[in-house]
Regions:
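N-terminal export leaders
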Residues: 1-3
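Serine-esterase "nucleophile elbow" of acetyl-processing enzymes
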Residues: 5-82, 97, 101-104
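Short beta->alpha connector loops of Rossmann-like oxidoreductase domains
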Residues: 41, 86, 116
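Alpha-helical cap/lid subdomain in secreted, periplasmic
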Residues: 25, 58-59, 63-78, 91-189
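Short, flexible loop segments at the rims of nucleotide/cofactor-binding pockets, characterized by
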Residues: 8-11, 84-89, 170-172
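Residue-level detector of flexible, active-site-proximal loop/helix-junction positions
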Residues: 38, 86, 159
Length: 189
């Protein structure tokens, strides 16, 4: 399993002539981006066709898909984005059958966790770091049970310090625990 930072290093490595052996793309591989608003980034929910800008949104999923489709045209990759703004891990699980398992991805990228923390701060959610880690671990075990050969890429949740939405005194260092938890799960899977 790769974290997003490792994926970025793999992309740079590939640009330098080295391809990461951790993610293997075959002809007709299906790649799925899953997560919250950072993944969603204004994608059109009514567009379910693979490889279209409308269903990719305007964020990292579009950038990654464009790069992969350009770099590997012979692979005829099928790339989807099913991020949903505001989602927490339990909400991913609620829609997992339709929005993940039905797609049968060969590579599954998940970026989730900001809302699991932020909604606690806002008083809208009674979660905790332990609930986040347990829910995500259970979801990953379930996914590997249903899709044993899926290659996982886990993105560390992040918050940009200094912006109007992030009060550093409220977010840090507690939010760093969510990142550490994700890293622990990435090492496990």
């Amino acid at each position: 399993m790769l974290t997003m930072s490792e994926l970025a290093k793999a992309v740079v490595s590939k640009q330098n002539g080295n391809v990461s052996p951790k993610i293997k793309l075959e002809k007709d591989s299906v790649i799925l981006f899953q997560g919250d608003s950072i993944t969603d980034m204004f994608r059109k929910y009514d567009c379910n066709q693979c490889n279209t800008p409308e269903q990719m949104g305007m964020g990292y999923a579009l950038f990654a898909a464009s790069t992969l489709l350009s770099d590997y045209p012979d692979k005829q990759l099928k790339i989807y984005n099913r991020g949903v703004g505001g989602n927490k891990v339990y909400q991913l699980r609620d829609r997992w059958e339709l929005d993940t398992l039905a797609i049968q991805p060969d590579v599954l990228s998940i970026l989730i966790g900001v809302n699991d923390f932020w909604h606690i701060l806002m008083g809208n959610y009674k979660g905790s770091l332990g609930i986040y880690e347990r829910d995500l671990q259970d979801l990953l075990h379930y996914t590997k049970e249903k899709l044993p050969n899926v290659q996982l890429v886990l993105g560390e949740p992040f918050a940009l310090r200094g912006g109007s939405a992030i009060d550093d005194a409220k977010w840090f260092p507690e939010f760093d625990g969510y990142r550490a938890s994700l890293k622990k799960l990435a090492d496990e899977f």
